Amino acid sequence: MTTREDILERLAYADALGHGPRTSALVAEAVSWADALGEEDLRVATRLALTEAYQQGNEEWKALEPFVWNLARYQRRPELFDDAQVRTLHWHFKRAVAVAAANPKVSKDKVRQLEASLEEF
């Protein structure tokens, strides 16, 4: 069975690799391990790391799913996030708005809604 230490080691290893699809794949695996383990703090931490890996690895659209998961979790259970994680989530929010704004399939109204939500955050 995968342990908390296994997950933390995987995140550290992925972080040391730099950015790119291989890193994203390793972090995505850590997310699935954290889900199986069921520890909420690890579920949050791994998704923050996955969002970052996708954003830094030139896979910005893939970052939206783990970002939205964390945003919803923060709205329901803010106590799961420490101050540094809240700042990271805020940064991810800014990047998500920029990614949405750059997509011609996302309406201007939707982008404005996202911007308003970011301001409220």
Predicted regions and their residues:
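Internal alpha-helical scaffold/solenoid segments in large eukaryotic proteins
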Residues: 24-34, 42-57
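Amphipathic alpha-helical repeat scaffolds of TPR domains
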Residues: 1-14, 40-53, 80-102
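A ubiquitous short alpha-helical element
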Residues: 12-17, 34-35
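Helix-turn-helix repeat elements of alpha-solenoid scaffolds
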Residues: 15-29, 56-75, 102-120
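Flexible helix-coil transition and linker loops at the boundaries of alpha-helical arrays
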Residues: 32-43, 73-87, 117-121
